[in-house]
Amino acid sequence: MIERIWSGESPLWRLLLPLSWLYGLVSGLIRLCYKLGLKRAWRAPVPVVVVGNLTAGGNGKTPVVIWLVEQLQQRGVRVGVVSRGYGGKAESYPLLLSDDTTTAQAGDEPVLIYQRTGAPVAVSPVRSDAVKAILTQHPDMQIIVTDDGLQHYRLARDVEVVVIDGVRRFGNGWWLPAGPMRERAGRLKTVDTVIVNGGVPRSGEIPMHLAPGQAVNLRTGTRCDIAKLTHVVAMAGIGHPPRFFATLKMCGVNPEKCVPLADHQSLTHSDVCALLNSGQTLVMTEKDAVKCRAFAEDNWWYLPVDARFAGHEPEQLLAKLISLASGE
């Protein structure tokens, strides 16, 4: 229902307009206060890169963060990652992730980023505290990437990168809750880089797509061609589950059942087992896998995806970040 409202297909969005106006007024005033200096942002002693969204829901932001971190690491840059830690609840903040940190403590995305990149990752509702935690433990850090946080103006940033779903784009264009917007589309004029996931990019936007890899078994780490799996039940607890289901079909998999879950939904062994009948194979997103690996069964698999770019624009972005990290 919410997708139909945000896309404008349902007229119910009009009933939510008063709340959207209030949301837009409050968020606009907050940004204006920081812009005019009425509120002061904390500036880190190293460059900060924000990778965020203008809309709620899945846009492909986390794969972009992972790509960015890996590319910087390959070029010898010491990079850390901070996040709000949505869906997690730590005993205390800031929380610096370790191999023992769970998604219940830190949230899905931070654990996924930590496991994929090995970079120092810290979470806190106050992102500046997360940055300080990383710099205390890793004083030689050269640059910080913040996963989400475009609207977290308490943390000063040197580069802003926005990721857009190229198919859904901005829906009906209204602020939450009548539409999907955290900020209006005009905000794009003030950011450094706009990356478009799928669809047709517009002038000045960098095209990107998510490329699936081989299926990975949660228990053994064994890899295989996803199309070889049979009697598949697909599960996705991400911002936009239909994208994952469409990816499976593109890979030649026709699931017997598709189960969309809420983003950041907690899962137990019994919850997941209840989705399957005897002889069926479960395929989930990598983001779900970080929650399920501890209690996985032999027939549970996940499909990793990686951000892929074409053209010279990504190299220009990386060159800019390397220059900042080097203090040039």
UniProtKB/Swiss-Prot annotation:
<comment type="function">
    <text>Transfers the gamma-phosphate of ATP to the 4'-position of a tetraacyldisaccharide 1-phosphate intermediate (termed DS-1-P) to form tetraacyldisaccharide 1,4'-bis-phosphate (lipid IVA).</text>
</comment>
<comment type="similarity">
    <text>Belongs to the LpxK family.</text>
</comment>
<keyword id="KW-0418">Kinase</keyword>
<dbReference type="GO" id="GO:0009029">
    <property type="term" value="F:tetraacyldisaccharide 4'-kinase activity"/>
</dbReference>
<keyword id="KW-0808">Transferase</keyword>
<dbReference type="GO" id="GO:0009245">
    <property type="term" value="P:lipid A biosynthetic process"/>
</dbReference>
<dbReference type="GO" id="GO:0005886">
    <property type="term" value="C:plasma membrane"/>
</dbReference>
<dbReference type="GO" id="GO:0005524">
    <property type="term" value="F:ATP binding"/>
</dbReference>
<keyword id="KW-0067">ATP-binding</keyword>
<keyword id="KW-0547">Nucleotide-binding</keyword>
<keyword id="KW-0441">Lipid A biosynthesis</keyword>
<dbReference type="InterPro" id="IPR027417">
    <property type="entry name" value="P-loop_NTPase"/>
</dbReference>
<dbReference type="GO" id="GO:0009244">
    <property type="term" value="P:lipopolysaccharide core region biosynthetic process"/>
</dbReference>
<protein>
    <recommendedName>
        <fullName>Tetraacyldisaccharide 4'-kinase</fullName>
        <ecNumber>2.7.1.130</ecNumber>
    </recommendedName>
</protein>
<keyword id="KW-0444">Lipid biosynthesis</keyword>
<comment type="pathway">
    <text>Glycolipid biosynthesis; lipid IV(A) biosynthesis; lipid IV(A) from (3R)-3-hydroxytetradecanoyl-[acyl-carrier-protein] and UDP-N-acetyl-alpha-D-glucosamine: step 6/6.</text>
</comment>
<feature type="binding site">
    <location>
        <begin position="55"/>
        <end position="62"/>
    </location>
    <ligand>
        <name>ATP</name>
    </ligand>
</feature>
<dbReference type="InterPro" id="IPR003758">
    <property type="entry name" value="LpxK"/>
</dbReference>
<keyword id="KW-0443">Lipid metabolism</keyword>
<dbReference type="Pfam" id="PF02606">
    <property type="entry name" value="LpxK"/>
</dbReference>
